[in-house]
Amino acid sequence: MTDEIKAPTPIELDYTAKAGTPLAKDAKRATHEDIIGALKSVQDPELMLNVFDLGLIYKIDQKENGDVDIVMTLTSPTCPMGEEMIQMAAQAVSSVVGVGVVTVNLTFDPPWTTDMLSEEIKLMMGI
């Protein structure tokens, strides 16, 4: 009898995480910098680097009503913490004052590469 090693299961390509509640009509909206700051608080648990500087955030779309739509990727489709990281990003941004409902959509198009790292992280890693 041999022990069979199974490959990690890829995360669903259409995975979406949501968090937050709608803003009141007269509420002041958060700044783009506040949203980026929240994303920088979310770390990839394997690399211990934040998702923004890793280049995992492809798009931030801040709506007039305070809702925020984010397109995010992972370093690998088989990332064991992928769903949790996407949910953590949604929760972090939704905790910012002036943000309503946050939707984080997963994509692997284009696939992530080290070219997407911030310059600071590239220098730190010697890339």
Regions found by a protein language model. Name each.
Residues 1-127:
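Domain-level signature for proteins that mediate thiol-based redox and metal-cofactor handling
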